[in-house]
Amino acid sequence: MSDEICEVVITGPDADWLAEFTRMLVADRFAACGQNITAIRSIYRWQGAIEDATEARVALHTRRDLVPAIVERADHDPPYAVPCVIALPVVDAAPAYARWVLAETKPT
């Protein structure tokens, strides 16, 4: 079991889809919480064309060793052919907050 926490960023097609996906991850204890940001503007290259789309984004706080399970969930419930899921290390956090994240997520 790892005591390292991280932030996992996921984008989705809209706020409703992403809120439901976040709720599922929190309910199943894959994430302690998720802060959803709606109406972000994404500009990216896809299949040879430049796309300009409105999306939603969530920042999940979780254990580092749960990231593969979150990636697997995103791959199995995808709104996109190539879902955006990235994990960023948390270099430092308030000790009480880090303990809370660990307590609210399931140990592997």
Feature roles, as predicted:
Residues 1-108:
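Positively charged, small/polar-rich N-terminal and surface patches that mediate targeting and assembly
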